[in-house]
Amino acid sequence: MEQAQEQIKDFPNTILFETEAEMLDMFLNLIEDADVLSGWNSEGFDMPYTVNRITKALSKEDTRRLCLWGQMPKKREYEKYGKTAITYDLVGRVHLDSLELYRKYTYEERHTYRLDAIGEMEVGESKTVYEGTLDQLYNNDFRKFIEYNRQDTALLDKLDKKLKFIDLANTVAHECTVLLQTTMGAVAVTEQAIVNEAHHRGLIVPSRPRRDENASNQAAGAYVAYPKKGLHDYIGSMDINSLYPSVIRALNMGPETIVGQLRQDYTQAEIDSKIAKGSTFAAAWEGKFGSNEYEFVMNKDRANDITVEWENGETSVMSGAEIYEVIYESNKPWMLSANGTIFTHEFEGVIPGLLKRWYAERKDMQAKLKECIKAENKVEEEYWDKRQLVKKINLNSLYGAILNMGCRFFDNRIGQSTTLTGRGIARHMAAKINEVITGEYDHIGKAIIYGDTDSAYFSAYSALRKEIDKGEIPWTKDTVVQLYDTIAEEVNSTFPQFMLDAHHCPKSRGEVIKAGREIVAIKGLFITKKRYAVLYYDKEGKREDVDGKPGKIKAMGLDLKRSDTPEFMQKFLEEILTKVLNGSQEEEILERIGEFRTEFKARPGWEKGSPKRANNITDYQAKEAKAGKTNMPGHVRASINWNTLKRMNGDKYSTNIVDGMKVIVCKVKDNPLGYTSVAYPVDELRLPKWFQELPFNHSEMETTIINNKLDNLIGVLEWDLESTTQNNTFSSLFDFE
């Protein structure tokens, strides 16, 4: 003990104990007044481990001290990565897993969620590095053992001080009157907010309905166009403000505002037919901007009978033309969604009213935030920033929650009314942009490059090229911004009339739909749906081509952002993309690719693998044990191979790969075991010698990591990427192993 006391004298607030029981007793005394307990991956590890250790070292009765009012922790099973895990829920005291909070409130997938890596990324600090196992560290370097444990706790504290996710969850809980732990989901929070809004109006909320287990919650998705592939110059984009919440507000969508539904006999027959022929549900809706019944109404069709299912239980059979007369020409306060759902605007629905209030509140909060930033009041700035972020989370969560069958207010008619009406609005925006530039109302016209959900990318450059070359139209970065602003203003002014014509929305409701010019880019690369990049120099009026920089890159869906692409490859792809968007020539870029291949070749084999997540390992192993050789995903097989080789080599120190773990998959050459690949855990900081000596298949990994990734990025340019492999192939002929 004296030696240990000497080792810790430089560490404040560090207490040594003779026994584990004494330490746990002190821990329970320390947390007696704590409201929230948190740790990193604490739901799956720290919480069950601590409960079990208290039970063993003290007694089961002592686990009551983790809770309030003398209650016992409640054992709970939950599914994680396809496997059943066990944890404990505390009574009275809240436990929030910092790892799960981080996943919830950061919107990009990380390569790894190891505390070490997240600490480095967020606060510039990592865990204390040591050799061997923690047991060896405890026995051989007690001082570093203490330092390691203190740094773990310090990292969590610094992450919380910077990110304030526990505070954010607490604010959400108070705003929506739910329990703190309830904020980890989205449905219950949104549902309670709707209930509160209804009660505020003096309304009674209906009981939770029983759902048909066979009912579908599938709804047609957003409009996504096929892009005009390749490089484009002088690109502008328009973006509809919060499309789905705005659609819900404009058509006053809510369970209590539904008047009737055009039964989708024709639509369902078409969708079922496509699915029967092999289409997916999403593909079956490709190119449709409304149900067939809605289109019959808009075309004033008289040839097809439509059944209207009224909300009072009655039905009517009418033609499209007759329904048009009832809704559009009879002065009824009715609106028709693109899904064929009839809503009333006689009174404001609870959900649209809630969205309206949240919008107004967020606007006020953002105004206060700007005042605090201007006054350099950091304390108030943090407060208002957190409040407006909560409102943003609420707004973005509502649509997804009401389309979840677990939500009390779930109604597929509202979900599909939102998406299909949103499709039509996005199509109108693109068509109107093209009309302003070319004179033709066409959503895939000459000026339109791409459309995705709530945005449209366009360019007037090719359409006006002759006039620009003749000098008839001034064309500079500044004049392009002015031109695209003018186009956006003209398009934006057309939404109220469009909403009246298409959905019988009163002007006051149609004005809810608004769009603005988002970016102006000097160049853009469009590859396929959901995959593109632009180099923009102006975003919503703020210039980004300052301090000698050409602007900023916006990249969507590319491998340089994907978590299954190695970090060094992400950086290289970003370098190539930057060169392409800055106008570098093919020869220069191919030369750089050739250099990178040489650099790649020099890397050890384990650095050339592909990141994956290994799910359902346990299930596949059980199937294989029962039925012999079983088909499974390659990365799962590679993970099992790691576990087998670890066991064969007597490796007791490396980490076993378990369900849900992130791994790096490395290809290997022919070998006596017949393995084609072996994975290793992303979080394995010290790779064993037996793994480093595996016969890695460098050429196959080069194909996977370089060839495929480059083809995904710049293959649409049809450059001679094959030429960059020739020197590399030649030099490999003289490599001996």
Please report, for each region that a protein language model flagged, where it lies by residue:
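Catalytic palm subdomain of template-directed nucleic-acid polymerases
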Residues: 456-487
